[in-house]
């Protein structure tokens, strides 16, 4: 529970770009990082803080960063993890825009990317080099729903180099069904546009990890690189949506299984891609 200062059951929408200081000295201390407090909503806002705390708790992370979209989350996490000359080992089955960022965007800045079938753990291990800084995957993958063994991939990466950052896109499961950090991942990213918000009226994303990395994402990946800041109103809507996450995910899963079984038995369907079958 986030203390909003007024005892409101639902956190108010702090629709402001800037915040006041009690004195010049206080402003200087905040800009210097010597005092905690809000400065400018690109760096932090109470509406965003309360929903970030909820996502961190749901995923079992120390901290979270709210972003304006799922791609904002992915980009902020990646730009905070690599620099020119580094390499990323990524799953060969990814959301189209993520693939475009890795396949086209990263190369423009001198970052190499290797795409590997993550069902082949030996291939994942073989792709790692001393230049590898990130192992990136989705599970279930978009759009085929292929399942990747997070624990085994994380084990392989960290045994090769404990400093490799394993980043998992958990959009398709949500933290209600799967918590990648508990399986050995270092960072979780979400498109909150989907199940996290759940009402089709928000575009948003999150990065969840340890406090040190989230601080780096906030002050470099988000502030300086992407600028993909979530609006206070969208943070309010997501906090509302999270209240029904468990109920919605139970119904989504039950309905999906019914559809998958129906299609599996239908004579006109050759194959159904669904991990529940």
What are these regions (language model features)?
Residues 23-75, 97-104:
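Conserved N-terminal alpha-helix of the aminotransferase class I/II PLP-enzyme fold
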Residues 14-16, 41, 273:
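Residues in well-ordered beta-strands of folded domains
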Residues 9-13, 36, 63, 234, ...:
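A generic secondary-structure signal marking the coil-to-beta-strand transition
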Residues 275-277:
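Active-site loops and adjacent core secondary-structure elements that bind or stabilize anionic groups
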Residues 17, 27, 34-39, 91, ...:
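A general marker of short, structured functional hotspots
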Residues 64-268, 273:
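Conserved PLP-enzyme active-site core in the AAT-like
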Residues 1-35:
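N-terminal glycine-rich, Lys/His-bearing helix-loop that initiates the first secondary-structure elements
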């Amino acid at each position: 529970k986030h203390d909003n200062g007024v005892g409101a059951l639902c956190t108010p929408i702090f629709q402001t770009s800037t915040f006041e200081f009690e004195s010049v000295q206080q402003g200087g201390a905040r800009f210097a990082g010597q005092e905690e407090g809000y400065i400018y909503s690109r760096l932090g806002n109470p509406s965003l803080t309360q929903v970030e705390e909820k996502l961190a708790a749901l995923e079992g992370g120390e901290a979270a960063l709210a972003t304006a979209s799922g791609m904002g989350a992915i980009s902020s996490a990646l730009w905070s993890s690599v620099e020119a000359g580094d390499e990323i080992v990524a799953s060969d089955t990814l959301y189209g825009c993520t693939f475009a960022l890795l396949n086209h965007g990263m190369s423009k800045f001198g970052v190499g990317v290797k795409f590997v079938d993550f069902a082949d753990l030996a291939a994942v291990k073989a792709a790692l080099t001393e230049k590898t800084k990130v192992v990136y995957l989705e599970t279930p993958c978009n759009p085929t729903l292929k399942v990747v063994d997070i624990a085994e991939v994380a084990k392989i990466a960290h045994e090769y180099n404990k400093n490799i950052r394993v980043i998992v896109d958990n959009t398709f499961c949500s933290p209600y069904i799967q918590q990648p950090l508990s399986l050995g991942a270092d960072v979780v990213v979400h498109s909150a546009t989907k199940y996290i918000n759940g009402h089709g009226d928000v575009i948003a994303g999150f990065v969840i990890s340890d406090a040190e990395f989230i601080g780096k994402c906030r002050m470099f990946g988000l502030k300086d690189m992407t600028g993909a800041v979530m609006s206070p109103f969208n943070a309010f809507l997501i906090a509302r949506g999270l209240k029904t996450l468990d109920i919605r995910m139970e119904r989504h899963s039950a309905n999906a299984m019914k559809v998958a079984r129906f299609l599996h038995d239908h004579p006109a369907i050759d194959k159904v891609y669904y991990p529940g079958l």
